[in-house]
C-alpha cells in the first residue's frame, strides 16, 4: 500500500508538532526540527516517539 501524500497536510511530528516531510526512498516521515525519522508501515505512518529513529545530516 502506498503512502498518501495528502496526509502531510494533517499529520505533525508528535514531539514538536511541526511539519513532516516524506522520504519516498526510505519510506519515512522526517522531522527536520527534531532530526527524527518516523517509519511508514504498509502505507501507514507510525507516529510514535519510541519508534522514531534519530537522523544525522552528512555535509
Swiss-Prot record:
Example of a GO cellular component annotation carried by this entry: cytosol
Family annotation (Pfam families): Trm112p
Entries under InterPro entries matching the protein: Trm112-like
Highest taxon, organism lineage: Bacteria
Signal peptide: none
Family: Belongs to the UPF0434 family.
Protein name: UPF0434 protein Sputw3181_2540
